[in-house]
Amino acid sequence: MWSVQKLLWGCRSLLPQGCRSFSLGNRDLRKVDFMPQPKNTDRWDNKRALYGVYDNIGILGDFKAHPRDLIIGPFWLRGWKGNELQRCIRKRQMVGPRMFYQDRENLTKRIRFLYKRFNRYGKHR
């Protein structure tokens, strides 16, 4: 009896098996490490380093100053959000008469292009 079992065990690849004949990857799932590796993140990048930088204005200044008043940039963009077309129109309204001729012409061309673009394509139609 033992010799028959050994014979069957030796040529088991010839006998039909009750399991899959193909592999789905790693057979032993106990050996797979499912714990992800920790990410190396920069804790002092621009976004994280400036988080909460204006919180002391409200605490020390009795909430009289708004952080948008402290942002340095073009005055037609301070504390204002919008798309490129709205930004160009706002710039033309506020500094248009003081611009050089070629800069104003380039701005007008850009406004014309964006106006056509926004009216022909996209979710703005």
From Swiss-Prot:
It is found in: Mitochondrion. Residues 1-29 form a transit peptide. InterPro entries: Ribosomal_mL51. GO terms for cellular component: mitochondrial large ribosomal subunit. GO terms for biological process: translation. One of its GO terms (molecular function) is structural constituent of ribosome. Disulfide bonds: none annotated. Signal peptide: none annotated. The keyword Ribonucleoprotein applies. Keywords: Mitochondrion, Ribonucleoprotein, Ribosomal protein, Transit peptide. Pfam families: MRP-L51. The keyword Ribosomal protein applies. Belongs to the mitochondrion-specific ribosomal protein mL51 family. Component of the mitochondrial ribosome large subunit (39S) which comprises a 16S rRNA and about 50 distinct proteins. This is Large ribosomal subunit protein mL51. It comes from Xenopus laevis.
